[in-house]
Amino acid sequence: MPRFKLTLEYDGSNYAGWQRQAELRTIQSALEQALFHFSGQQLTITTAGRTDAGVHATGQVAHVDFEKNWRTHTVRDALNAHLQKQGDNIAILHVQNVPDSFDARFSAIKRHYLFKILNRRSPPALNTKRVWWIPKPLNAQAMHEAAQKLVGKHDFTTFRSAHCQAKSPIRTLERLDVQREGEEIFLYAQARSFLHHQIRSFAGSLMEVGIGRWTTQDLEAALHAKDRTRCGMVAPPSGLYLTKVEY
């Protein structure tokens, strides 16, 4: 069966995450509904990253197997038409033929995430579900300097969900940069894979540094404690975006 790689974007605000769930609207269920209307087949789509409820994507990757070897632009345009008809905030950006050995999840060698913070006194009126609004002034430079203590290979028990199903809490974080652009602060994270709630836990803990409640040493101590209770708050999903997957 011909295998196709799909690159897509979506606004996760009104979805219960990626993974199919009974009686809940998810990204996977919406895509599989569109795939059925297009192909007449009950197909299963596999993704690089099963994003949580409220998390967005600008460069999510998935793969699906069809019985027919469709033209890639036909797949893209037909799926987009069905998604729009369904009222879904999902768009197929690119479609590519790939070998059977390609797996959107297991072939990935690097995942890139962005976390957006709106740092101003006034709340957002337009992007309420696409940023984390923090009215208190944040020191982005202090946040960036502290974030470098998290880069590298570590036991990230402190920064993963208590419900994380990963066998090991050890991950190698390749990048965690914090940059301010006007009223917005961007956190850029890069690794082969991440733990459940890891980036949102980073964002919440770095917020503590940004407002001056924590020092860099406090963040480092929280990391080495390997204790979930030492983590700062878990930032809301609204600010998180999966931006790119490398293979």
UniProtKB/Swiss-Prot annotation:
SUPFAM superfamilies: Pseudouridine synthase. Disulfide bonds: none annotated. It catalyses: uridine(38/39/40) in tRNA = pseudouridine(38/39/40) in tRNA. Keywords: Isomerase, tRNA processing. Coiled coil: none annotated. Pfam families: PseudoU_synth_1 (PF01416). Substrate binds at Y113. It is an enzyme of class 5 (isomerase). One of its GO terms (molecular function) is tRNA pseudouridine(38-40) synthase activity. Its EC number is 5.4.99.12. One of its GO terms (biological process) is tRNA pseudouridine synthesis. PANTHER family: PSEUDOURIDYLATE SYNTHASE, TRNA PSEUDOURIDINE SYNTHASE-LIKE 1. Belongs to the tRNA pseudouridine synthase TruA family. Homodimer. This is tRNA pseudouridine synthase A. It comes from Bartonella henselae (strain ATCC 49882 / DSM 28221 / CCUG 30454 / Houston 1) (Rochalimaea henselae).
